[in-house]
């Protein structure tokens, strides 16, 4: 008896990851490149001078949703400062990185925040302040409390890390990823709500007028 042939069913195409752009800002030698390299490749190099901008990508899963983080690592040297502003455009999040052993880098991170605010609309970009090099805490010039108080005053996320020891590096990027997804979902719900209200109202009726 001939067996019935089953019609092959097309497989559902895997959903594409949702893409978010993340920029790393801060003075030279604070460890921006080291943080990105540690997170993306679990590698560490103490000296990674960036010329202009370096680019990394990583796909992460937040619950059932895949996110693709496009990580733009900007150069911290003053001569590249104006060029780095070009990478602000379209950014969803920014990490303001400073070296906890250098007070000047902490003050410079505050200037980077002002630059961001001048380029982008308030609330347009999610910002986290990151104090790097906790492995050198005996040489600390910026206390945890100083960083936390400034972050709180500006409504920023805040965390301290060590790219060298791989301390809280994944936590920094994963926290940002979770916040970005939550923001995106909330904005999507708000837009759908506005659209539903507009549909319920329907087109405005024009009043008829009679000519006498």
Swiss-Prot record:
Tissues with expression: Expressed in melanocytes (at protein level).
Entry cofactors: Mg(2+)
Modified residues (Phosphoserine): 29
UniProt keyword annotation of GTP-binding present: yes
Record-listed E.C. numbers: 3.6.5.2
A molecular-function term among this protein's GO annotations: GTP binding
InterPro entries associated with the record: P-loop_NTPase, Rab_GTPases_membrane_traffic, Small_GTP-bd, Small_GTPase
Top-level taxon in the UniProt lineage: Eukaryota
GO biological process: anterograde dendritic transport; cilium assembly; endocytic recycling; establishment of melanosome localization; filopodium assembly; immunoglobulin transcytosis in epithelial cells mediated by polymeric immunoglobulin receptor; intracellular protein transport; melanosome transport
GO cellular component entries: apical plasma membrane; basolateral plasma membrane; dendrite; dendrite cytoplasm; early endosome; endocytic vesicle; endomembrane system; extracellular exosome
Membrane-topology descriptor: Lipid-anchor
Motif (Switch 1): 43-54
Chain positions recorded as GTP binding sites: 31-33, 50, 76, 132-133, 135, 163
Residues reported to bind Mg(2+): 33, 50, 73
First and last residue of the signal peptide: none
Induction of the gene: Up-regulated by forskolin probably through the transcription factor MITF.
UniProt xrefs under SUPFAM superfamilies: P-loop containing nucleoside triphosphate hydrolases
Compartments it resides in: Recycling endosome membrane; Melanosome; Cell projection, Dendrite
Pfam families on file: Ras (PF00071)
CDD domains, per the entry: Rab5_related (cd01860)
Description of how activity is regulated: Regulated by guanine nucleotide exchange factors (GEFs) which promote the exchange of bound GDP for free GTP. Regulated by GTPase activating proteins (GAPs) which increase the GTP hydrolysis activity. Inhibited by GDP dissociation inhibitors (GDIs).
Keyword Lipoprotein: yes
Known role: The small GTPases Rab are key regulators of intracellular membrane trafficking, from the formation of transport vesicles to their fusion with membranes. Rabs cycle between an inactive GDP-bound form and an active GTP-bound form that is able to recruit to membranes different set of downstream effectors directly responsible for vesicle formation, movement, tethering and fusion. RAB17 is involved in transcytosis, the directed movement of endocytosed material through the cell and its exocytosis from the plasma membrane at the opposite side.
Domain-level remarks: Switch 1, switch 2 and the interswitch regions are characteristic of Rab GTPases and mediate the interactions with Rab downstream effectors. The switch regions undergo conformational changes upon nucleotide binding which drive interaction with specific sets of effector proteins, with most effectors only binding to GTP-bound Rab.
Protein name: Ras-related protein Rab-17
């Amino acid at each position: 008896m001939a067996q019935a042939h089953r019609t092959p069913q097309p497989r559902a195409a895997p959903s594409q990851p949702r893409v978010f752009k993340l920029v790393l800002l801060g003075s030279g030698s604070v460890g921006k490149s080291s943080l990105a390299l540690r997170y993306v490749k679990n590698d560490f190099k103490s000296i990674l001078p960036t010329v202009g901008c370096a680019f990394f990508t990583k796909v992460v899963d937040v619950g059932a949703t895949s996110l693709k983080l496009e990580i733009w690592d900007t150069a911290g040297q003053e001569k590249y400062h104006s060029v780095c502003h070009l990478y602000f455009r379209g950014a969803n999040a920014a990490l303001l990185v400073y070296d906890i052993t250098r007070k000047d880098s902490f003050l410079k991170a505050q200037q980077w925040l002002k630059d961001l605010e001048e380029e982008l609309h308030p609330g347009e970009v999610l910002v986290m302040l990151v104090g790097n090099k906790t492995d050198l805490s005996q040489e600390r010039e910026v206390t945890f409390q100083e960083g936390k108080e400034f972050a709180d005053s500006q409504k920023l996320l805040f965390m301290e890390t060590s790219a060298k020891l791989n301390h809280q590096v994944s936590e920094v990027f994963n926290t940002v990823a979770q916040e970005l997804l939550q923001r995106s979902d909330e904005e999507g719900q708000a837009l759908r709500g506005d659209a539903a209200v507009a549909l319920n109202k329907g087109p405005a009726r024009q009043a008829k007028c009679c000519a006498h």
